[in-house]
Amino acid sequence: MRTRLIGNKLFAMTLVVLFVILASTIAGQAAEWKPTKPIQFVVPYAPGGGSDVLARSMIAAIGSEKLCPVPFVVVNQGGGSGLIGTTTAAQAKGNDHMLLTFISGQVAAALAAKGAPTFRDLTLLAGLAIDEELIVVKTDSPFKTIEDVVKAAKQRPGTITIGGTATGQEDQMCNRLFERAADLKFRYVPFNSGGECITAVLGGHVEMIWANPSEFVPQWEAKMVRPIVVAKEKRMTELPDVPTFKEKGNNVTFEMFRGVGAPPGISPEVAAFYENMLKRMAQSAAWNTGYLKKYMLSPTWRGSKEFTQFVAQNEPVFKGILTELGLIK
């Protein structure tokens, strides 16, 4: 009897050990998915803008840290306020070899266009950073301060030109917040990217632009442009001489997020590979020095679940501003 009990116990223990080994093997195999061909990195804006800089900086950091076994190919699909490129990713269901830069403006664009794919039609992988919104002028502009802009706008309502990336996105939403706070009216001029905005202000085609640091840092370092105000609670450490709107009596703040998405329908193993890759990238010196510090962004890691929730929370805020702009009926 005793021998039989011992035998039963050994048999049961053997089954448990085999089950653990089998489960570990299956889990290991699931976690071992890796891309096998070049990854298309869709940027839904023209070259030279903030999203383009984001994608190329990510690729450089990932390459520096050897986090991906295959190369990336940047595919710029500007137009439609970011909707053309976003639609490309949304329609590539189950494509394991495609990523998409995903920012606040793509949420807004989807709200303003009926039937357009929303963030719910994508797999959001990670939120990586918060970018700042500033008003930037050409170095020799007569607008030395934001007070100069306000004074001129009151004298010439609806005629002061201010450029920004696309219609109904972060730049135009910030512009509306400024108009509302200061009781002003500008003539907003949309462009396909931050790079085009810089070209326009340098060429005198618009009097000022809304821009992120990643879009104007090279020209600022070359003393070609000047930021005059930032839509932030406190001054930027990197630009201590640039005041906030709030300091000047206008309650204008805006947090522009930058992140990464993928097509819908990818497997949990594929999503886990990319999320882990991005997390390791976000911890690297190559990323923190080569992108965040260089272009003056704030690090804000959010994993897939948290980033998706964060985007959902911002959606009704954007909807309210777009309704004011008459872009949502």
Label for each model-derived stretch:
Residues 36, 180, 184, 266-329:
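An extracytoplasmic/periplasmic, membrane-proximal ligand-sensing/linker region
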Residues 78, 159, 163-167, 171-242:
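Ligand-binding pocket segment of bilobal, Venus flytrap-like solute-binding proteins
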Residues 1-12:
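N-terminal secretory signal peptides that target proteins for export/translocation
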Residues 39, 48, 55, 74, ...:
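Residue-level signal for nonpolar/aromatic packing positions in well-ordered secondary structure
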Residues 30-121, 159, 183-208, 219, ...:
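N-terminal (or domain-start) structured segment
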Residues 64, 88-98, 110-196, 245-247, ...:
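Hinge/capping helix and adjacent helix->loop/strand transition within the periplasmic-binding protein
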Residues 12-25:
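Bacterial N-terminal signal peptides
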Residues 103-104, 139, 213-214, 232-233, ...:
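Short secondary-structure boundary segments
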